[in-house]
Amino acid sequence: NLSNLGLNSAENFIRKYKIHNEILWDLYREDKISKEELRGKRFYLTLKEYGIEDERLSEKIGLEYVRKSPLKKKLFPYTIDVLNYLNKKYEMHIITNGFEEVQHVKLSQSGLSSFFKHIITSEKVGVKKPNIKIFEYALNKAKAQKDESILIGDDLIADIFGAKNAGIQQIYFNPNKIIHDENIEFEINCLSQLKELL
């Protein structure tokens, strides 16, 4: 409980956490820190901003977060509708840098498992997006050709640049309308827009 630690605003804590989490995920993706360091440091650095330097507490919060996070069922608007639409026309797979032990629980809890044939995690493959090897592995696993495949992703570097470098068409899902200078052929802010493209 955050109030027990003297932290009055959960919103401020979450905002600070998200900043640290994003920076650490970038370092993890670049193989500059380990999975364990990512898990431990994101809460340690957040708590440190409040004058709390407690590694054991940070680790405890981190483990609890990893346990509870996949159980959340909140989806983007139109998720099920669009997946039902795509499922009739395409074979779908997931490529993720997320932790192996979390992904299957997350998909199962949110009722999405049945839509995807393969869940390809960077931990299993041994390389992370945007490394082209994970995209090549995915194509091979799906028995698919580059020119018949398309990647829909919400991370410009890991997903969009990664797929582009691997020769795969991409659609950038940018729900927060993040401003960027990149020349993206297909960019959407709402999943319902996929019906117009696919």
For each feature predicted by the language model, list its residue ranges.
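N-terminal helical cap/lid subdomain that shapes the substrate entry/recognition surface
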Residues: N1-P77
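Secondary-structure boundary/capping signal
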Residues: G6-S9, D54, Y90, I94, ...
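A short alpha-helix capping/helix-coil boundary motif
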Residues: H20-L24, E59-L63, D81-L83, L112-F115, ...
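Solvent-exposed, flexible loop/coil residues
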Residues: Y28, E37, R42, P77-I80, ...
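A generic structural signal for short
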Residues: D31-K32, L71, M92, E123, ...
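Catalytic-core regions built around general acid/base machinery
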Residues: Y78-K89
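Asp-based, Mg2+/Mn2+-dependent phosphohydrolase catalytic module
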Residues: N84, I95-L198
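Glycine-centered short loops/turns at secondary-structure junctions
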Residues: K89-Y90, G167
